[in-house]
């Protein structure tokens, strides 16, 4: 998979931010992990969820990945404009993660699996890289 099905328009970026903002209390009221955690955000897109979850965990480190460099650039800009400094954005494919097994304390993904050709395989690949548990919202 190498393209986001809804495209990369400004309209879509605004829709994603509106969606994240309107559901943040419902989805992320408990998205708080232990200080010092290393968290993988798989399929971060434009950073719509990142801007909500990373500030709640300012003493943890996020590695937020996506396959789209354009989306990652937007995510970096959103993080910078919100003074979010605990996130490293990286181009990576969920099916070919460049990290050691059990590297992450937690993994979270939101609105990602429905875009995968094989979501079970995606979860299996992610499972190799986690020590604790992961959260996903689809």
For each feature predicted by the language model, list its residue ranges.
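Class I SAM-dependent methyltransferase Rossmann-like catalytic core
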Residues: 2-21
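Conserved alpha-helix/loop element of class I SAM-dependent methyltransferases that forms part
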Residues: 18-37, 52
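A generic alpha-to-beta junction signature in SAM-dependent methyltransferases
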Residues: 33, 57, 116, 130-131
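Short glycine-centered segments of the SAM/dcSAM-binding site in methyltransferase folds
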Residues: 38, 61, 133-135
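Class I SAM-dependent methyltransferase SAM/SAH-binding core
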Residues: 40, 46-96, 121
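A short acidic, Gly/Pro-enriched loop at the edge of an enzyme's catalytic core
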Residues: 95-106
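A short SAM/SAH-binding and catalytic strip from SAM-dependent methyltransferases
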Residues: 105-119
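A short glycine-rich, Lys/Arg-flanked "PGG" loop and its adjoining helix->strand segment in the class I
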Residues: 120-135
């Amino acid at each position: 998979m190498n393209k986001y099905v809804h495209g990369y328009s400004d309209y879509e970026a605004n829709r994603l931010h509106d969606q994240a903002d309107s559901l943040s209390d419902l989805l992320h009221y408990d998205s708080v992990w232990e200080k010092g955690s290393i968290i993988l955000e798989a399929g971060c897109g434009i950073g719509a969820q990142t801007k909500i979850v990373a500030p709640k965990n300012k003493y943890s480190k996020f590695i937020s990945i996506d396959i789209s460099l354009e989306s990652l650039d937007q995510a970096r800009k959103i993080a910078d404009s919100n003074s979010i400094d605990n996130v490293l954005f990286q181009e990576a494919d969920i099916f070919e993660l460049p990290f050691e097994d059990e590297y992450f304390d937690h993994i979270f993904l939101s609105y990602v699996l429905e875009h995968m050709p094989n979501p079970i395989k995606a979860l299996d690949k992610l499972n190799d890289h986690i020590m604790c548990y992961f959260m996903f919202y689809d």
